[in-house]
């Protein structure tokens, strides 16, 4: 009908928020920064008009509801140990593709920028939504089609398509932290079969490692790896041993020695190996 699918928003950003002095004091008492409650412009930024009937999907596994309208998100991979409620804007993965379902049309946008980026889908102001990034280029691919599956087709044309996985990977897989020994794994496997609950794979979390050192195995708690894996394989389970790639700082640990000798690890701006604390301690 000649109506444009997308319109750039040209009036600038304005936060629909009035905060009294009393509210500022409450926010500050709870640890919030009130120094800049206005709109923060990013070095890379683009704004679009937001229509009342627009619904948003995509972005990968983010918190909140399936429809992302009226929420804000960040593309900045983060390991959040707390409950994943809607207050958290980033999780483990960053997939910068957004799909919009309008009343009679659909469209999508792929933001090809690897820097820390932000999407505010009407939370700041119901009149617009915006994409911003700390740096990089504004490389935006517009995806069009008659239905949402058409957008997926166009998006994967750009990124490449994943081959069909093995059939067992599409079944239920059991995964949790806290299996302290091989007997815990055996107990879980037996209960699944005794209760006739379909399950195709059991994930071994970082408990199986020796002191959380990647590419090691704790023989004292888990026995020989081949024995346990063969045992649950007879019950119809595949085994997935997870990797948490924080390499423990330990001069006697082969991974640490090899990484330092070959310069495999991330460094800071001074060229010093970057160290932070994760599961094995300093890593």
Regions found by a protein language model. Name each.
Residues 60, 163-283:
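Aromatic-lined carbohydrate-binding/catalytic grooves of carbohydrate-active enzymes
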């Amino acid at each position: 009908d000649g109506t444009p699918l997308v319109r750039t928003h040209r009036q600038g950003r304005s936060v629909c928020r009035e905060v009294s002095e009393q509210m500022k004091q409450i926010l500050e008492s709870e640890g919030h920064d009130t120094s800049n409650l206005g709109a923060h412009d990013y070095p890379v930024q683009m704004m679009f008009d937001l229509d009342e009937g627009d619904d948003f999907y995509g972005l990968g596994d983010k918190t909140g509801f399936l429809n992302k309208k009226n929420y804000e998100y960040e593309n900045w991979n983060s390991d959040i140990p707390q409950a994943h409620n809607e207050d958290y804007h980033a999780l483990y993965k960053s997939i910068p593709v957004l799909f919009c379902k309008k009343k009679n049309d659909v469209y999508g946008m792929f933001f090809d920028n690897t820097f820390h980026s932000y999407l505010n889908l009407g939370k700041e102001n119901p009149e617009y939504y915006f994409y911003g990034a700390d740096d990089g280029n504004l490389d935006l691919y517009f995806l069009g089609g008659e239905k949402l599956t058409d957008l997926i087709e166009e998006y994967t044309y750009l990124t490449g398509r994943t081959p069909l996985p093995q059939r067992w990977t599409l079944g239920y897989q059991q995964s949790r932290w806290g299996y302290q020994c091989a007997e815990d794994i055996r107990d879980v496997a037996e209960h699944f079969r005794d209760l006739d609950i379909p399950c195709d794979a059991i994930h071994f979390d970082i408990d199986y490692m020796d002191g959380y050192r990647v590419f090691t195995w704790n023989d004292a708690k888990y026995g020989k790896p081949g024995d346990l894996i063969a045992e649950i394989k007879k019950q119809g389970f595949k085994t997935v041993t997870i990797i948490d790639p924080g390499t423990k700082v330990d001069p006697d640990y082969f991974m640490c020695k090899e990484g330092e000798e070959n310069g495999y690890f991330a460094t800071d701006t001074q060229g010093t190996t970057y160290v932070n604390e994760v599961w094995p301690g300093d890593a």
